[in-house]
């Protein structure tokens, strides 16, 4: 255990917390072509590849994903939530953080109902998470 005098001379270092969605913590100045330290809650990007992947054991499915080039020129893999989607290559999408536990390397979600991504059709409950408008009564 250090003495008070030792702590005065050299204080304790606080732990550095690693980000769970690092691509959202980097901005980009396109005029100067340099990355910046601007963080953002969401980022816009262009889908470069849309496909399916299989989850880790013990799960079994075909999970929909998109490879997205963000506005800060970083390319990431993002999950497409909900049943059915209208995304294809060159679709403009909005990304948020949030990993998918059974897909290794997928740390981002695509926001449904924003930009080129349509909301989930015929959804009655939990509509706000899937970008679905209120149905006509």
Swiss-Prot record:
Outcome (variant: residue 56 to T): In strain: GP204; streptomycin-resistant
Q: Does the keyword Cell inner membrane apply?
A: no
Q: Which GO terms describe its biological process?
A: translation
State the GO CC annotations: small ribosomal subunit
Q: Which UniProt keywords apply?
A: Methylation, Ribonucleoprotein, Ribosomal protein, RNA-binding, rRNA-binding, tRNA-binding
Q: Which residues form a coiled coil?
A: none
In this chain, where does the modification 3-methylthioaspartic acid occur? 102
* Alphabetized GO MF terms: rRNA binding; structural constituent of ribosome; tRNA binding
Q: Which Pfam families match?
A: Ribosom_S12_S23
* SUPFAM superfamilies in UniProt: Nucleic acid-binding proteins
Query: Can the keyword Magnesium be found in this entry's annotation?
Result: no
Q: Where is the signal peptide?
A: none
PANTHER family named among the record's database cross-references: 30S RIBOSOMAL PROTEIN S12 FAMILY MEMBER
Query: Which function does this protein serve?
Result: With S4 and S5 plays an important role in translational accuracy.
Regarding protein family, the annotation reads: Belongs to the universal ribosomal protein uS12 family.
Name of the protein in its database record: Small ribosomal subunit protein uS12
